[in-house]
Amino acid sequence: FGWGQTGVVGRVGLRFNNFSMQNLFGKGRKRAGFIPQGDGQTLSISGQTNGTYYQAYSLSFLDPWFGGKKPNQFSAAISYSKQTGVNSDYYSKNYYNSYYNYLYGLGSSSIYDNGYNFYDPDQFVKMFSVSLGFGKRLSWPDDLFSFMVEANYTRYMLKNWNYFLISDGNCNNFNISFTLSRNSTDQQFYPHYGSEFLFSVSATPPYSLWDGRDYKNLANNYNSATYQREAQEKYRWIEYNKWRFKFRNFTALGSKYKCPVLMTRFEFGILGSYNRYKKSPFETYYVGGDGMSGYTTGYATETIGLRGYDNGSIANNGYSYSRMTLELRYPLMLETSTSIYALAFLEGGNAWYSIRDFNPLDMKRSAGFGVRIQLPMVGLLGVDWAYGFQKYSGTQKIGGSQFHFIIGQEF
């Protein structure tokens, strides 16, 4: 469970770790009940909802030994989500002006307003996504490195969505991502030693370099009678380049299997553009809170947790972010069926609406403690209490004492 502006958000998921697509339709082959098993593939099904306002469903498949001979990885995923209109402080006509002024350096204005109905089923944004990926283990610099290429397509469908730059129409996002990663940890749930490293670049085609449109003078005035038509044309195919770096290191503070472990983490992300007048309104960073992906006060954003702060309070449409964590873990139970550990942490991070303001040393800090539990067929669950030391941003309360619920493994 998590918490959004419209109440409790529930999530349910199933994960089959020894799935066999080959045995799915075979008779008399290896099964666990009705589940075909034996090939080490992973099938995941999940859903999130808070009832009326938000629903999301996803299905993913992973084959770590694609072809059966070499450790080549094949992945496929499909997802659908729908968010209906809510009364949100972050989406008002003042917000359009503030956000649009940010895009082109024209100043800023207040983003707070309460003028919309709390719920309207005729206002919505829908997202449909599909992706295919292929990865390969590398032999250099060592065999712990892997490289993955993934093709992704997302279609955004908006109707009467008066909380955004575009209220009606369809937007398309086709991108190719390249990911270099290395993992030397001894296990997934409670690593004692080793590190995880990831560097990725995702890029769309640079449509604005050849389509001949004058983006400087296209959809640059929200109050214009032709704004929505121009915005649909401007963002029919969105463009960007997105850079990610993530690193975690684990150090055992003892020689026994059940010993404390110190985890350190540093990560950052940057969302760039090819044309300063066509910055992507999608794929931005939603920073603060528990970091649960999916339902946020925004949509089509990458959710970054920062414990001790309200969800999205650091940034709801940031173009760069950084985060650092120092976390001490202590095992309470490490069994095959169920594992539990307690933790205490110091954390800091921030997000910026301009890449030029990016500064990893400019941090909003927090501290706290929590617990994690790993359950079969369910995965990772957790709860944290944290205190954000920067309680206010201007007059808005963003930090202080916070409880956060965690679902799913995070890197």
Go through the PLM ranges and name each one.
Residues 342-347, 362, 366:
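Small/polar glycine-rich anion-binding or flexible loop at a beta-alpha turn
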Residues 1-6, 15, 159-332, 337, ...:
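C-terminal outer-membrane beta-barrel translocator/porin domains of Gram-negative envelope proteins
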Residues 292-298, 356-411:
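C-terminal beta-signal and terminal closure region of outer-membrane beta-barrel proteins
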Residues 1-190, 196, 386-411:
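Gram-negative/organellar outer-membrane beta-barrel architecture
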Residues 83, 333, 349-351, 376-378, ...:
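Short Gly/Pro-enriched loop/turn and capping motifs at secondary-structure junctions
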Residues 91-94, 281-283, 359:
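Short secondary-structure boundary/capping segments
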Residues 69, 138-145, 254-260, 335-337, ...:
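Secondary-structure transition into beta-strands, especially the periplasmic turns and strand N-termini
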Residues 53, 126, 172, 239, ...:
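Short, glycine/acidic-rich beta->alpha junctions
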